[in-house]
A protein has these predicted regions:
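N-terminal core-binding DNA-recognition domain of tyrosine site-specific recombinases/integrases
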Residues: 3, 67-153, 165, 187, ...
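N-terminal DNA-binding module of tyrosine recombinases/phage integrases
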Residues: 7-13, 17-108, 263, 268-270
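Active-site/catalytic core of tyrosine-dependent DNA strand-transfer enzymes
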Residues: 83, 173-177, 226-229, 251-296
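Basic, Lys/Arg- and aromatic-enriched nucleic-acid-binding interface segment
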Residues: 123-126, 130, 145, 149-209, ...
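C-terminal catalytic core of tyrosine-transesterase DNA break-rejoin enzymes
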Residues: 127, 145, 194, 198, ...
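Catalytic-site neighborhood detector that most strongly recognizes the C-terminal catalytic loop/helix
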Residues: 170, 227, 280, 318, ...
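DNA/chromatin major-groove-contacting recognition/catalytic segments
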Residues: 178-182, 232-238, 338-358
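C-terminal secondary-structure termini that scaffold catalytic or DNA-interacting sites
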Residues: 218, 231-233, 237-245, 249-254, ...
Length: 358
């Protein structure tokens, strides 16, 4: 395992042959190392990776994990996972050998995450802590399932955090109408919030909409994509889940509003985004509108909860609502169970009648 000096650059490089997973011999060259030791260490880790040798460092295995998983996930999903890996997991585990990571190491890492406070003294939320642990566990589980690691130290150590989500807030119809009236001074904001409230779509789905997504003759809105801003780029991805691809019937008043809005956009093209604003813009507008209307501030996503709440109040079933908002019906039943009217009284009355008839 030799390393070579690059006399022109004053650095070291590794150059060697290896067999890839198909048994084909290939040459590998990597430049820019400060010392011979660094070059040799990199070559050693690379060869351990190729052999899937579990004495490789955790950092080396993460590169294998990235190769295996990245192409299988939506770009925005991977971006979130990668940020967690690079900033919250690798700084602690990168130098440890994969096979030597113990539950006590995971517990020590968990304690660091639990003790973290930002400059304002704020800790990580329970749901974020659970997400961090879940990502570490996913990496180690990948090693167990596909590369022969004996056990998942993160699973043995146990989880941290919880699945308790932020309080679900929503506006009543009356609150939304007050807000909407304030928004009328900015047509783009007004129509964006009209779609969010009356159709219950996600923020990314809204920002991806183009004229081609509307069939105004039939009052239909097709949800087939989502917008994300990733690393300074506008990215159009598939919707969140396969169930999210759907066609929504719009109420007639909203169909008329969208027809007017599309006519007002100068030379809009069929595939051009009709809301070329950022998520932060919508959040700012939500702040402004809630304050001026005198209604409580809710999150953009809570407009989706508000739509579901309205449909439940109108008497629609969980299945019908799920089809409209792109959820599984069991998710609607679970998340919004407290909003559905109780059938217990009706059940008791009918059972009473059955007993009397007997």
């Amino acid at each position: 395992m030799p390393a070579y000096k690059d006399n022109r650059q004053g650095t070291w490089y590794a150059s060697f042959y290896f067999e890839n997973w198909q048994g084909v011999k290939q040459k590998k060259l990597k430049r820019g190392f400060a010392t011979k030791k660094d070059a040799l260490a990199w070559e050693r880790e690379f060869l351990l990776q190729q052999a899937a040798d579990l004495t490789m460092t955790f950092e080396a295995f993460v590169e294998i994990y990235i190769t295996d998983k990245k192409k299988r996930l939506r770009e925005n999903t991977w971006s979130t996972k990668e940020h967690i890996i690079r900033t919250k997991i690798l700084p602690y585990f990168k130098e440890k050998k994969l096979s030597e990571i113990k539950p006590r190491d995971v517990i020590a890492w968990q304690n660091e995450m639990l003790n973290y406070r930002d400059k304002n003294g704020k800790a990580y939320s329970p749901t974020y802590l659970k997400t961090l642990h879940g990502q570490l566990s996913a990496i180690l589980n990948h090693a167990v399932r596909f590369y022969g690691l004996k056990s998942n130290a993160a699973a043995t150590a146990g989880c941290m955090g919880s699945e308790k989500h932020k309080e679900m807030l929503f506006w009543t119809k009356e609150e939304y109408l007050k807000f909407a009236e304030v928004m009328m001074d900015k047509p783009q904001s007004y129509y964006a919030f009209e779609i969010l409230y009356w159709c219950g779509i996600r923020e990314g789905e809204l920002l991806a909409l183009t004229p081609a997504d509307f069939d105004l003759d039939k009052g239909l809105l097709s949800i087939t994509k989502s917008y994300q801003r990733l690393k300074g780029r506008d990215v159009i991805t598939d919707p969140k889940t396969p169930k999210s691809v759907r066609v929504i019937q719009m109420p007639q008043f909203l169909t008329d509003e969208i027809r007017d809005y599309l006519k007002s956009i100068y030379k809009v093209q069929p595939d051009q985004r009709i809301f070329e604003v950022t998520k932060s813009y919508l959040h700012h507008e939500m702040d402004r509108g809630a304050k001026e209307a005198g209604v409580k501030r809710i999150r953009i996503h809570d407009l989706r909860h508000s739509h579901v709440s309205l449909l439940i109040e109108m008497g629609f079933s969980a299945l019908a609502i799920a089809d409209r908002v792109g959820h599984e019906s069991v998710d609607i039943t679970y998340k919004y169970a407290h909003l559905f009217p109780s059938k217990q009284q009706e059940m008791a009355q009918k059972l009473n009648m059955e007993r009397k008839e007997g």
